[in-house]
Amino acid sequence: MRIMARIGVENSLTDVQQALKQQGHEVVTLNSEQDAQGCDCCVVTGQDSNMMGIADASIKGSVITAHGLTTDEVCQQVESRT
C-alpha cells in the first residue's frame, strides 16, 4: 500500500483540497509559513509568487503553482512529485 503524502494547500483552493482528500492524502490548509513545515509538497494559487514565504526553503518538498491548471492537473502534479 502506498503511503499518502501530507500536502499543504492554499486556503482558497477548496476544490483541490477536496480532490486530494478523496485520493487519501493528508491535506493541511496553508494560513502561514509554519503550516507548510512538514508537508511533502505545497499547492499555491500563484497569484503571489512567494505566498507567505513558502517559495523559499521553508518546506522540503515541491511548491506547485495551480494558476492555469485544472483540479485534475494539480492532482497529477502532486502524484508525480510525492
Swiss-Prot record:
Protein name according to UniProt: UPF0180 protein BCE33L1278
Record InterPro entries: UPF0180 (IPR005370)
Sequence similarity: Belongs to the UPF0180 family.
